[in-house]
């Protein structure tokens, strides 16, 4: 969970972001390099690339119309969700939005840090949730030193507060600049600090340094709540308040209210589906334009795979001829061309053991050796070693929590996250297979019923539901009610993103003529009560939770495990069906070396899968490796306690938890399993593994289980 060579696109490839016939979109996203604390960089900056994921050599490309099966099954398993993602990418402000999951997981961390800075106990009181701009002058005076009257001005960079030369202008859009007049937003105006620096004749330097530290912490934490990439822009000229922009106790109340409204501008709803793209949104209906484009893309991928295979064969012949010439010369001329072979996994494990033993000298030497042979632009092992070395270095320096907070506080474009998710769907069957099985199981359960209520824990962007809505329109249109549950977002609109997901889904339901109702819940999952869900016993009730339960804390953090609390709530809901998908991992152990080893094995499978299927130059692959999986690895390695939010367990551990909650596991429909296996073996790499164990559907890569899916019912309905 980072001097970069120039990267070139693969000529002749089509842009996968144009799969659904929508208007042209930017084909790449940029990464802003940020250097954090120890000097190494966790972010990428690359040229614009237009690439398509290269299918593996063993993939088979078969048209849907050649199979004697229900074409609707092909629709469900095809990239139906890509049309939904493409529509989201066409929304005007998607590039400016930050990732929903990123914000929700860090809100609690931000609250805790603010309370630690002022010496109060968490959890916060309601008034504490206000942004930094709403603090009163008394609280601000306790944070800002009162004797800023001396020499240099202060700049706020990634490394903390730094003295800068005079003459710069401090702008919150550019935190590393500074001026001799420092203005900080406050509830009744701007409090202004005049002078050229800090008075060295302070009577109490210790108190002064503490105030500086507190001020730095408050600025860093407050920036997380500022809209649009931490920019806080207050336009007093438009509000006719220029003359009152300084601290003034006699300013007008009207001007106060106008200034407050300008600090955090209200976000007004927009048309989720604009008129120029409504006609082009097709959810990959068999025979439709989107399916034709999908088949054309498969043809292009097939040609690319054949070309790559031929190129690899020619390269092997050249290497064989080179070895033959070397032997003919007696082997003396080939020594300089040999590359040093390094077992990066062993080095990483030995380094983790040294870090756990606090052997800094040995750990430093091993880290230096790992850095020498790892790179974010090499093969899969080198990229994996680079990510894990970042985590080890942060843990060794004792700055893991600060570095992780610094990374997650940097906004990630929601468009970039969607494009990366689009790539993951294209190259890996895990989530697509889960969507297909879940939707097919729900449809079979609903049958001819007139009403269905889906409660989705961790709905995020609602990727899986457009296909279900479309299928309901094909085989009867029951009233669909979806309750989308997400963690709250920071700011004054904690439910904004989950509400936007509902608006998109409502637009799809209207497009296909399906009666639809949506309710958004933005709360901590363990704080949700049964009354919040509006259960109607006359409806078919389905609870869905796919691959998000790992972010709930367990008994090692909280005596009353959040995981058991949520499962007990699901038992009280008494659903007709509970679909449960988990990330299968054993790296939730309290002992660091054990956790590190298991995390290394888990992420090795993912990085090897990407190395086998996706070209190294692909931008979205780099984003997945560094910004998604690399960030998760950093959290697992460098963070402890409540700050460690990546806590997956094995499917056997989750099985025990679910049974303790009064749930009974039921088998999958054999016909669904048969269709799923056929699809995976037909359209995906041969090294993807689909298996069953104790009624769990196991999905993995080269024999290692990565994800698991199961279906449960209450004891009363089993």
UniProtKB/Swiss-Prot annotation:
It comes from the Eukaryota. Keywords: Nucleus, Transcription, Transcription regulation. A motif (VHIID) lies at residues 452-456. Residues 335-713 form the GRAS domain. One of its GO terms (molecular function) is DNA-binding transcription factor activity. InterPro entries: TF_GRAS (IPR005202). Residues 500-532 are annotated as: Leucine repeat II (LRII). Residues 638-713 are annotated as: SAW. Residues 421-484 are annotated as: VHIID. Residues 541-635 are annotated as: PFYRE. Expressed in cotyledons, leaves and flowers, and in the elongation zone in root. Residues 305-338 are annotated as: Disordered. It is found in: Nucleus. One of its GO terms (cellular component) is nucleus. Residues 316-328 have a biased composition (Basic residues). GO terms for biological process: regulation of DNA-templated transcription. Belongs to the GRAS family. Probable transcription factor involved in plant development. This is Scarecrow-like protein 9.
